[in-house]
């Protein structure tokens, strides 16, 4: 089946990854308004949670304005067609949190691990399947391992019961060849019935291009967000990806103009820091740093009189991964002690 004949599954992440862009401070009214617009525009799923997934609200990652369940319930009140999705990182969220999210209305879960740690997802994937959820394996920081090793990890998630596996460019560090190689490796390793997905970040301005290449390589699901609302320079902007898909003649099933209106009229005004490629977010992609480190690094830079870029580049040199936000202050203090 070619790209024009098959339907692309459009997975919106404005209300989960987009949390990072405003330090997890969406109001319930904001969440409801955005979800209603997305639902009316025809997206397939709407992911809802703290930026770091279920139970992510904490000192380490940042406290949310509301609980995950309050946000999910607010979305459940307004959506009529789209499925509600959520994110779970083993070690942060538990199966008890997943059951509560399911009871609140979530029917899709993406179980996320570092790209070489799929083995820690087994319990959560198996439990999600027992609930009857659409269960996705989400391999974060996929640039940090080879395509062949990524395929090995993907097969583990598949063996636990995941019916879709994502290549996740958490650092926005990959180019089109990197994406192509990883999807080819996954397609060769996985059962043909297992779907694949792409989660791109825009730190090198390649979020849309990488998503297009993924679809060309047989990718079934595409993550994107209104106005690119997400960590770092954001995700692939949903309205831009859909416009490009429309020009390519692809079947996406969404209303482009409704998405454009929602991006500019609803989402962009909420940004307290522009979601864009700039000096700091470009450093994320260039150094291969976890995108949600951005706001934490800027806080540390202000506190200690440093440049955020220097902190981010050093984090990349040390190959820090998601979950190591506490190391940002350590890096800042090291830079203070040992200035270049």
From Swiss-Prot:
A GO BP term here is: catabolic process
Q: Which PROSITE patterns match?
A: PYR_CT (PS50991)
Q: What class of enzyme is it?
A: lyase
Q: Which GO terms describe its molecular function?
A: 2-isopropylmalate synthase activity; 4-hydroxy-2-oxovalerate aldolase activity; manganese ion binding
**Chain positions of site Transition state stabilizer:** 16
**Keywords attached to this entry:** Aromatic hydrocarbons catabolism, Lyase, Manganese, Metal-binding
- Alphabetized InterPro entries for the sequence: 2-IPM_HCS-like, 4OH_2_O-val_aldolase, Aldolase_TIM, DmpG_comm, DRE_TIM_HOA, PYR_CT
Enumerate the residues binding substrate: 16-17, 170, 199, 290
Give a single Pfam family match. Answer: HMGL-like
> What's this protein's name?
4-hydroxy-2-oxovalerate aldolase 1
């Amino acid at each position: 089946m070619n790209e024009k004949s098959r339907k692309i599954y459009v997975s919106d992440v404005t209300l989960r990854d987009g949390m990072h862009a405003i330090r997890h401070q969406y109001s319930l009214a904001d969440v409801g308004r955005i979800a209603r617009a997305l639902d009316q525009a025809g997206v397939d799923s709407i992911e809802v949670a703290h930026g770091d997934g279920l139970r992510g609200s904490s000192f380490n990652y940042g406290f949310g304005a509301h609980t995950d369940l309050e946000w999910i319930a607010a979305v459940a009140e307004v959506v009529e067609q789209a499925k509600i999705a959520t994110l779970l990182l083993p070690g942060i969220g538990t199966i008890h949190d997943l059951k509560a999210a399911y009871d609140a209305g979530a029917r899709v879960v993406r179980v996320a691990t570092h790209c070489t740690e799929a083995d820690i997802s087994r319990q959560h994937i198996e439990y999600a399947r027992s609930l009857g959820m659409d269960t996705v394996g989400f391999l974060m920081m996929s640039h940090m391992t080879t395509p062949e090793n990524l395929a090995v990890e993907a097969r583990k998630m598949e063996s636990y019961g995941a019916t879709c596996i994502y290549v996740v460019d958490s650092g926005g560090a990959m180019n089109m060849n990197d994406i192509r190689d990883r999807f080819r490796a996954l397609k060769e390793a996985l059962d043909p019935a297992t779907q694949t997905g792409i989660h791109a970040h825009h730190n090198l301005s390649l979020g849309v291009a990488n998503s297009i290449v993924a679809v060309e390589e047989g990718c079934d699901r595409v993550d994107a967000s209104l106005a690119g609302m997400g960590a770092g320079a954001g995700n692939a902007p949903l309205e831009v990806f859909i416009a490009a898909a429309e020009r390519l003649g692809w079947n996406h099933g969404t209303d482009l103009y409704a998405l454009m209106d929602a991006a500019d009229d609803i989402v962009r005004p909420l940004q307290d820091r522009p979601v864009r490629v700039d000096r700091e977010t470009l450093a994320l992609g260039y150094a291969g740093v976890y995108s949600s480190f951005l706001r934490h690094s800027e806080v540390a830079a202000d506190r200690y009189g440093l440049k955020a870029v220097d902190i981010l580049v050093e984090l990349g040199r040390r190959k820090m991964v998601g979950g190591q936000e506490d190391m940002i202050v350590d890096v800042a203090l090291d830079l203070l002690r040992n200035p270049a």
